[in-house]
Amino acid sequence: MKKLMVIFMCLVMCVSFVGCNNTEKQNDEAKETLQRVLEKEQTFTAKTIVFSDKTTEQTLEKYHFQTIDNAYYSFVPEQYAFVDMDNDNIDELVILDVKITYYLVLHYENEKVYGYNIGARSLIDLRTDGSFMTSSAGGISSIGNMCFDGSECKVINKALANDYDQEYFIDGKKTDQKTSKKYFDDWNENTSKISWVTIK
């Protein structure tokens, strides 16, 4: 019986080791590809009009987009950070245009790079674990991570506070203001802000 247990434990350790090595290899491949985009050597797929279904091949050097109110932005990459935005152990590349306070999140999937432009209030206080805060003019704040599917990305809220309507949620379940505030305070104190690297 002991011998069987030892064999079983060895098999579990081997599978875990292979799994870790495979994820590390995928992360290295993703970062190498994203680095080529950063160095303007490779294109990425992105929407040039927010809320449109159409995508085009872009280069970081000439990346531009149009918002829902038809404002036109020519994106100027100034700072970047590698961070796992969707908790799959594979890093995304987040690039910041300081002047217009817009972010470009680059995600590697199935040998392609996809880009998503994110406004300032939709990506506040990005943390090393990929979590971030969002805020709206209506007194609604949330903490969440991103989820990617090809050219689409969405925010998965871990916590949401609607002070205007006095509604509070943690992991999709309703809670009270005190518990919600503690969650936001704990997140603020116990997670680390990312360190941006200046693009030279």
Regions found by a protein language model. Give the residues of each.
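C-terminal motif of bacterial Sec signal peptides marking the signal peptidase cleavage site
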Residues: 16-19
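Beta-propeller blade termini
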Residues: 76-85, 122-131
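A short, surface-exposed interaction/processing loop segment used at functional sites
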Residues: 109-130, 154-167
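Positively charged n-region of N-terminal signal peptides that target proteins for export
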Residues: 1-8
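Blade-edge motifs of beta-propeller repeat domains
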Residues: 26-75, 112-122
